[in-house]
Amino acid sequence: MKSVRILLALVLGLGMVQVAHAHRFAPSLLQVDEVAPQQYNMVWKTPAQGVSNVPLRPQWPQSCEVRSASEPQLEGTGVVTNWQLQCAGLGESGLVGQTLGVSGLGANQASVMVMVNLLDGRRYQQVLDTEHPDFVVPAQSTAGD
């Protein structure tokens, strides 16, 4: 009987390790790819479990219109959503000089990796957190050329 209890404790302990592996403090990812002038595919991946009822929500320029959006899909320990944006109101420079951000970072004690890939090959990466919840897309690449 004692060995059954020990075995049960080990199995439960391993189960808790698996639950802990789905870490709610893992950073989210916001990837923005320019696919045509003023057209962008946006991928948002965030942990399925949060620490708050306040959702994490990507933010983009108001002049960008959502052309299509996927339903959130469970993928591993995260939830993935895709959007296609049309940003004709931004002019020829597109997202350069524009602000991307995520709301809800403070309430969730979260961070987000933002990755922006433009048609001309410029690439940008920035970590957003409670102190820096926004990213202004610069004219010069920050990810090395």
Name these PLM-found stretches:
Residues 1-6:
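Positively charged n-region of N-terminal signal peptides that target proteins for export
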Residues 7-15:
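Bacterial N-terminal signal peptides
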Residues 17-19:
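N-terminal signal peptide c-region/cleavage motif recognized by signal peptidases
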Residues 21-145:
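Histidine-/acidic- and/or cysteine-rich, low-complexity loops and terminal segments associated
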